[in-house]
Amino acid sequence: PSWPMTFQFTPLSLHDIVLILPTRHRDDRGFFSETFRASAFERHVQRPFVQDNLARSAAGVLRGLHFQLAPRAQGKLIQVLRGEIWDVAVDIRRSSPTFRRWVGTPLSAETGHMLWVPPGFAHGYVVTSDGADVAYKVTAEHEPALDRGIRWDDPDLKIQWPKIGPIAPRDPIVS
Protein backbone atom coordinates (compact mmCIF):
# COMPACT_ATOMS: atom_id res chain seq x y z
CA PRO A 1 0.00 0.00 0.00
CA SER A 2 1.12 3.53 -0.73
CA TRP A 3 -0.47 5.19 2.33
CA PRO A 4 1.40 5.79 5.58
CA MET A 5 0.66 3.40 8.44
CA THR A 6 0.52 5.47 11.58
CA PHE A 7 -0.55 5.22 15.18
CA GLN A 8 -1.42 8.02 17.58
CA PHE A 9 -0.21 7.35 21.14
CA THR A 10 -2.09 9.30 23.85
CA PRO A 11 -1.04 8.98 27.52
CA LEU A 12 -4.04 8.86 29.85
CA SER A 13 -4.29 10.39 33.34
CA LEU A 14 -1.98 7.64 34.62
CA HIS A 15 0.59 8.59 32.01
CA ASP A 16 2.15 5.11 31.76
CA ILE A 17 -1.21 3.90 30.41
CA VAL A 18 -1.40 4.73 26.71
CA LEU A 19 -4.44 4.86 24.44
CA ILE A 20 -3.40 3.85 20.92
CA LEU A 21 -5.37 5.01 17.91
CA PRO A 22 -4.42 3.17 14.72
CA THR A 23 -5.05 4.83 11.37
CA ARG A 24 -7.90 3.16 9.49
CA HIS A 25 -7.85 3.40 5.72
CA ARG A 26 -11.46 3.20 4.51
CA ASP A 27 -12.92 2.66 1.08
CA ASP A 28 -16.03 1.06 -0.41
CA ARG A 29 -14.75 -2.41 0.55
CA GLY A 30 -14.41 -1.58 4.26
CA PHE A 31 -11.16 -0.60 5.96
CA PHE A 32 -7.57 -1.69 6.47
CA SER A 33 -5.59 -1.01 9.62
CA GLU A 34 -2.34 -2.15 11.13
CA THR A 35 -2.77 -3.24 14.73
CA PHE A 36 0.91 -3.57 15.61
CA ARG A 37 4.24 -2.50 14.16
CA ALA A 38 7.32 -2.99 16.34
CA SER A 39 9.11 0.13 15.08
CA ALA A 40 6.10 2.34 15.86
CA PHE A 41 5.59 0.86 19.32
CA GLU A 42 9.19 0.77 20.56
CA ARG A 43 8.99 4.18 22.30
CA HIS A 44 5.96 3.07 24.30
CA VAL A 45 6.47 -0.69 24.68
CA GLN A 46 10.04 -1.63 25.60
CA ARG A 47 9.45 -5.38 25.89
CA PRO A 48 8.66 -7.94 23.23
CA PHE A 49 5.29 -9.68 23.21
CA VAL A 50 5.52 -13.41 23.93
CA GLN A 51 1.90 -14.59 24.07
CA ASP A 52 -1.42 -13.64 22.45
CA ASN A 53 -4.74 -14.23 24.24
CA LEU A 54 -8.39 -14.06 23.16
CA ALA A 55 -11.39 -13.84 25.49
CA ARG A 56 -15.04 -14.04 24.44
CA SER A 57 -17.49 -12.69 27.01
CA ALA A 58 -21.24 -12.17 27.21
CA ALA A 59 -22.93 -8.87 28.06
CA GLY A 60 -22.20 -7.67 31.58
CA VAL A 61 -19.25 -9.97 32.21
CA LEU A 62 -16.55 -8.33 34.31
CA ARG A 63 -13.06 -9.78 33.96
CA GLY A 64 -10.44 -8.71 36.46
CA LEU A 65 -8.82 -7.11 38.13
CA HIS A 66 -5.91 -9.38 37.23
CA PHE A 67 -2.14 -9.10 37.44
CA GLN A 68 0.86 -11.38 37.57
CA LEU A 69 3.72 -11.11 40.07
CA ALA A 70 7.38 -10.58 39.17
CA PRO A 71 9.42 -12.01 37.64
CA ARG A 72 6.53 -12.65 35.23
CA ALA A 73 4.68 -9.34 35.56
CA GLN A 74 2.80 -8.76 32.32
CA GLY A 75 2.39 -5.75 30.12
CA LYS A 76 -0.76 -5.99 27.99
CA LEU A 77 -1.81 -4.51 24.66
CA ILE A 78 -5.62 -4.76 24.62
CA GLN A 79 -7.83 -4.60 21.54
CA VAL A 80 -11.55 -5.29 21.09
CA LEU A 81 -12.34 -7.36 18.00
CA ARG A 82 -16.12 -7.48 18.51
CA GLY A 83 -18.36 -5.37 20.72
CA GLU A 84 -17.48 -2.82 23.40
CA ILE A 85 -15.87 -2.84 26.84
CA TRP A 86 -14.99 -0.38 29.54
CA ASP A 87 -11.35 -1.06 30.37
CA VAL A 88 -9.65 -0.30 33.71
CA ALA A 89 -6.02 -0.24 34.85
CA VAL A 90 -4.95 0.16 38.51
CA ASP A 91 -1.41 1.19 39.45
CA ILE A 92 -0.11 -1.44 41.91
CA ARG A 93 3.53 -0.26 41.93
CA ARG A 94 4.19 0.61 45.59
CA SER A 95 6.94 3.12 44.71
CA SER A 96 4.77 4.96 42.16
CA PRO A 97 3.31 8.42 42.89
CA THR A 98 0.05 7.10 41.38
CA PHE A 99 -0.04 3.91 43.50
CA ARG A 100 -3.65 2.66 43.94
CA ARG A 101 -5.03 5.11 41.40
CA TRP A 102 -7.04 3.85 38.45
CA VAL A 103 -8.02 4.97 34.98
CA GLY A 104 -10.85 3.70 32.80
CA THR A 105 -11.63 4.14 29.12
CA PRO A 106 -14.06 2.69 26.60
CA LEU A 107 -12.67 0.43 23.87
CA SER A 108 -14.64 -0.93 20.94
CA ALA A 109 -14.26 -2.84 17.70
CA GLU A 110 -15.89 0.12 15.95
CA THR A 111 -13.12 2.59 16.85
CA GLY A 112 -10.24 0.11 16.87
CA HIS A 113 -8.59 1.96 19.76
CA MET A 114 -6.18 -0.12 21.82
CA LEU A 115 -4.80 0.25 25.33
CA TRP A 116 -1.24 -0.35 26.55
CA VAL A 117 -1.12 -1.43 30.20
CA PRO A 118 2.51 -1.89 31.33
CA PRO A 119 3.75 -4.35 33.97
CA GLY A 120 2.90 -3.16 37.48
CA PHE A 121 -0.80 -2.56 36.83
CA ALA A 122 -3.87 -4.65 37.56
CA HIS A 123 -6.20 -4.86 34.59
CA GLY A 124 -9.88 -5.58 34.10
CA TYR A 125 -12.88 -4.75 31.97
CA VAL A 126 -16.64 -5.03 31.81
CA VAL A 127 -18.53 -5.84 28.61
CA THR A 128 -20.90 -2.96 27.79
CA SER A 129 -22.36 -4.43 24.57
CA ASP A 130 -24.26 -7.66 23.79
CA GLY A 131 -20.94 -9.49 23.89
CA ALA A 132 -17.27 -8.87 23.17
CA ASP A 133 -14.17 -10.56 21.84
CA VAL A 134 -11.04 -9.07 23.39
CA ALA A 135 -7.53 -9.83 22.12
CA TYR A 136 -4.43 -8.97 24.04
CA LYS A 137 -0.73 -9.38 23.55
CA VAL A 138 1.33 -9.88 26.71
CA THR A 139 5.00 -9.41 27.57
CA ALA A 140 5.31 -12.50 29.81
CA GLU A 141 3.83 -15.95 29.53
CA HIS A 142 0.97 -16.85 31.85
CA GLU A 143 2.20 -18.45 35.08
CA PRO A 144 -0.75 -19.65 37.22
CA ALA A 145 1.36 -19.73 40.42
CA LEU A 146 2.03 -15.98 40.04
CA ASP A 147 -1.54 -15.02 39.09
CA ARG A 148 -3.22 -12.56 41.47
CA GLY A 149 -6.32 -10.41 41.56
CA ILE A 150 -7.98 -7.44 43.22
CA ARG A 151 -11.72 -7.30 43.85
CA TRP A 152 -13.57 -5.31 41.21
CA ASP A 153 -15.47 -3.50 44.00
CA ASP A 154 -12.51 -2.84 46.34
CA PRO A 155 -13.80 -0.04 48.62
CA ASP A 156 -10.42 1.68 48.78
CA LEU A 157 -10.11 1.97 44.99
CA LYS A 158 -13.67 3.24 44.37
CA ILE A 159 -13.60 2.29 40.69
CA GLN A 160 -16.55 3.85 38.89
CA TRP A 161 -17.71 0.93 36.74
CA PRO A 162 -20.43 1.85 34.24
CA LYS A 163 -23.98 0.86 35.11
CA ILE A 164 -24.92 -1.89 32.68
CA GLY A 165 -28.33 -2.86 34.03
CA PRO A 166 -29.75 -4.36 37.19
CA ILE A 167 -27.24 -6.35 39.21
CA ALA A 168 -28.54 -9.71 40.44
CA PRO A 169 -26.93 -11.44 43.44
CA ARG A 170 -24.68 -13.45 41.10
CA ASP A 171 -23.85 -10.48 38.86
CA PRO A 172 -21.67 -9.18 37.51
CA ILE A 173 -20.15 -12.40 36.27
CA VAL A 174 -16.56 -11.98 37.42
CA SER A 175 -13.56 -13.96 36.29
Q: What are the language-model segments listed below?
A:
Residues 3-113, 129-131, 138-175:
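Non-catalytic, conserved peripheral segments adjacent to functional cores
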Residues 121-123:
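Recognition helices and adjacent regulatory flanks at domain boundaries
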Residues 126:
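A short local structural element in Rossmann-fold oxidoreductases
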